[in-house]
């Protein structure tokens, strides 16, 4: 289903998760990996992030995963391809572990998103039968992440690049901005513009970001989409 070798391994894990159980707990595949896989593998993403915005369902998942079964609690029964290679660690922010597929480690996390509520995904919002965040919630969560860390060089401005590569219709992007602003106010648009300006003004920075994320699409195309993103949020 996916072209990149690491994404194929992520796809294997997705296909072995208990999709119905995760949906029942309002736990959705999100973050940069879900976006990269859904929008054409324009970059490589290495970790798996699931997101829950319901405290009751998060509590139930925390109890499930911190029990004796560990990750097996949310996997299909009798599977042999995925193994847990790190103890489950759970706190008020998330549930974290690492999985192995063919001796390749993959970080796995379920994050409690307490700032915005997620809408229920539709049938089109799936990867390997696993429900993902909707495009609206993917964008809103990326807008929040961008405000948190756009100036962190180690992040390589991936949040604004992900938003640009999604190519959301203007109306949907503005709806995502409004949703993110419920948590962070007008800093959402301000920080988005700052991130774009940083990419434009720091010589060679976009090249460095693209290299770090193994992006092979033309740089001119990335610039085109970043500039379109800025126009949408400043009109």
Roles of regions detected by a PLM:
Residues 1-235:
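Compositionally biased terminal segments of proteins
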């Amino acid at each position: 289903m996916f072209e990149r070798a690491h994404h194929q391994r992520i796809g294997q894990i997705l296909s072995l998760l208990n999709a119905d159980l995760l949906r029942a707990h309002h736990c959705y595949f999100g973050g940069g990996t879900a976006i990269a896989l859904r929008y054409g593998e324009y970059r490589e993403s290495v970790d798996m992030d699931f997101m829950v915005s319901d405290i009751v369902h998060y509590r139930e998942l925390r109890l499930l995963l911190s029990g004796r079964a560990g990750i097996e609690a949310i996997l299909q029964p009798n599977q042999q391809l995925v193994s847990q290679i790190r103890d489950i660690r759970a706190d008020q922010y998330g549930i974290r572990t690492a999985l192995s597929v063919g001796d390749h480690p993959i970080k796995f996390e379920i994050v409690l998103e307490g700032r915005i509520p997620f809408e229920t995904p539709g049938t089109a919002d799936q990867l390997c039968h696993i429900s993902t965040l909707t495009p609206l919630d993917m964008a809103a969560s990326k807008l929040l992440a961008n405000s948190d860390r756009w100036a962190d060089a180690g992040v390589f401005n991936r949040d604004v690049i992900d938003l640009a590569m999604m190519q959301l219709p203007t109306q949907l992007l503005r709806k995502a901005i409004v949703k993110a602003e419920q948590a962070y106010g007008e800093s959402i648009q301000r920080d988005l513009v700052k991130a774009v300006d940083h990419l434009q003004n720091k010589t060679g920075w976009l090249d460095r970001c693209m290299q770090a994320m193994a992006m092979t699409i033309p740089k001119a195309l990335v610039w085109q989409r970043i500039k379109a993103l800025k126009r949408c949020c400043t009109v």
